[in-house]
Amino acid sequence: MERITVTLGERSYPITIAAGLFNEPASFLPLKSGDQVMLVTNETLAPLYLDKVRGVLERAGVNVDSVILPDGEQYKSLTVLDTVFTALLKKPHGRDTTLVALGGGVIGDLTGFAAASYQRGVRFIQVPTTLLSQVDSSVGGKTAVNHPLGKNMIGAFYQPASVVVDLDCLKTLPARELASGLAEVIKYGIILDADFFTWLEENLDALLRLDGPAMAYCIRRCCELKAEVVAADEREAGLRALLNLGHTFGHAIEAEMGYGNWLHGEAVAAGIVMAARASERLGQFSSADTQRIIALLERAGLPVNGPCEMSAQDYLPHMLRDKKVLAGELRLVLPLAIGKSEVRGGVSHEVVLSAIADCQQA
């Protein structure tokens, strides 16, 4: 069992990583006998894990209600969020309740925002079931729903009480979802840790076949890196923005193509290559390193070009709504070398459009 702490003073919390955690009531600390829980999951995951998690909590004396939501990025919306509020109010659940997010990034983000909002804030626990949510979205307290004009535009910074990563969940993960998660894994190596990037080049095949020790190390290292960044910059005033490598371009793809048509990691993968191309055009990143990135993403089964349905010009309206924009000026996360990156303002639209054009599907 691996345990990492996100250090945020009174709001510090553990990330527990191991196989078989759904069998252990102690995995779900700080829950205790007599506590009230609303377990939030989706239609795909409910048949796989709902009864198991409910059972282990009830054996510990926890009172469990549940709400099952539709599955997909397109349901990460205010309308579906209201479904959670209605379920909480009908019981009713008070300020002493705990929301448990059992799912991937959509469930985690939406449930976290529900917890931040319901009665001005209740406790919640992240139980991520996808690789993407285990290495990234469950850690750090970013919660949100989407708006038709932009991804994650309505939300709050709100930290969980704990994160429970059961590696056994990956056994039921579709190959496309596994690849999507690997985009965020690869991102960490590019922005923060050259040695980890090299390790990924050497061990990607083991990750693709869900080798237990390799996957445990991979998730632990990503969570360590994320925890360090969040502890230093919880509200994304500086360092934490580096975690958005590829996301300014990727969010544009998701919004333009319709949420769910491109998985988040797929859009981020294409966006990472666009960011690398932009950095190349600015003379601060080598084409050889871009090729290393492309090769690793392709081996993971990820796209390295944007959708053919989008022109370069289609990206800009979405990118200009990005949360990093200041005074109407684009600010991009750009790689400087493998393991090193920066947030840069003043990147011209010409450079951005050229980088996108370099990555358009034929």
Swiss-Prot record:
Q: Name one GO molecular function term.
A: 3-dehydroquinate synthase activity
The note on cofactor binding and number reads: Binds 1 divalent metal cation per subunit. Can use either Co(2+) or Zn(2+).
One cellular component GO annotation, for this chain's record? cytoplasm
Look up keyword Zinc and say if it applies: yes
Q: Which reaction does it catalyse?
A: 7-phospho-2-dehydro-3-deoxy-D-arabino-heptonate = 3-dehydroquinate + phosphate
Chain sites annotated for binding Zn(2+):
E184, H247, H264
Q: Which InterPro entries match?
A: Dehydroquinate_synthase, DHQ_synth_AroB, DHQ_synth_fam, DHQS/DOIS_N, DHQS_C
> What Pfam families is this protein classified in?
DHQ_synthase, DHQS_C
What keywords were assigned to this record?
Amino-acid biosynthesis, Aromatic amino acid biosynthesis, Cobalt, Cytoplasm, Lyase, Metal-binding, NAD, Nucleotide-binding, Zinc
Q: Where does the UniProt annotation locate this protein?
A: Cytoplasm
CDD domains listed in its UniProt record? DHQS (cd08195)
GO terms in the biological process aspect are: amino acid biosynthetic process; aromatic amino acid family biosynthetic process; chorismate biosynthetic process
From the UniProt record, give the pathway where this protein acts: Metabolic intermediate biosynthesis; chorismate biosynthesis; chorismate from D-erythrose 4-phosphate and phosphoenolpyruvate: step 2/7
What EC number(s) does the entry state?
A: 4.2.3.4
Highest taxon of source: Bacteria
Cite the binding residues for NAD(+): 71-76, 105-109, 129-130, 142, 151, 169-172
Q: Does the keyword Lyase apply?
A: yes
Q: What class of enzyme is it?
A: lyase
Instruction: Tell me its cofactors.
Output: Co(2+); Zn(2+); NAD(+)
**Membership in a protein family:** Belongs to the sugar phosphate cyclases superfamily. Dehydroquinate synthase family.
Q: What does this protein do?
A: Catalyzes the conversion of 3-deoxy-D-arabino-heptulosonate 7-phosphate (DAHP) to dehydroquinate (DHQ).
Task: Name the chain's protein.
Answer: 3-dehydroquinate synthase
The scientific name of the source species is: Salmonella schwarzengrund (strain CVM19633)
Give the lineage.
Answer: Bacteria, Pseudomonadati, Pseudomonadota, Gammaproteobacteria, Enterobacterales
Encoding gene per record: aroB
